[in-house]
């Protein structure tokens, strides 16, 4: 929890309470339904919560922004972002029902009011959003093909509507074929921990489609 306050020192008391509750909740649920590697649960705040919040270092979402978290798994990056942006609406989608159950139960336990959930495949979600966020669920080109239909045209954020992904490693081969405007942000410039040395936020403009 101290790690979150290190980089986000201006949290409200409610946000602090919500972030602090995540460790016990994920530890408990993860013992029943595996949504995080059992070996990695002790790194929850660094590898999962703070990593999710890396998106907030790229864009400060305006109130009433509508965001879909595609392939949310146990709720990443959607739940940490929903805590940080209480006036933004998040819709968390995953094709695995038991993972959606965990994310739903955790969101309810901490009193998140700005999240909804759906158990479905990405292709089945037809609604429009300002942004789609995701954490390394599939190659970038494949992801763009699936979510193009979900990006609305109306703009009200500093960045045009589009896709924001958390990815790691060498991404040149993955981003080179992408025809949309793509920007890479190195999280090592925001977070000093070794885990973030190869981690990036990938932003793809997909507005107006």
Curated annotation (Swiss-Prot):
The keyword Cytoplasm applies. CDD domains: AdoMet_MTases. It comes from the Bacteria. It is an enzyme of class 2 (transferase). Pfam families: GidB. Keywords: Cytoplasm, Methyltransferase, rRNA processing, S-adenosyl-L-methionine, Transferase. S-adenosyl-L-methionine binds at residues 71, 76, 122-123, 135. One of its GO terms (molecular function) is rRNA (guanine-N7-)-methyltransferase activity. GO terms for cellular component: cytosol. It is found in: Cytoplasm. InterPro entries: rRNA_ssu_MeTfrase_G (IPR003682), SAM-dependent_MTases_sf (IPR029063). The keyword tRNA processing does not apply. Its EC number is 2.1.1.-. Specifically methylates the N7 position of a guanine in 16S rRNA. Belongs to the methyltransferase superfamily. RNA methyltransferase RsmG family. This is Ribosomal RNA small subunit methyltransferase G. It comes from Phocaeicola vulgatus (strain ATCC 8482 / DSM 1447 / JCM 5826 / CCUG 4940 / NBRC 14291 / NCTC 11154).
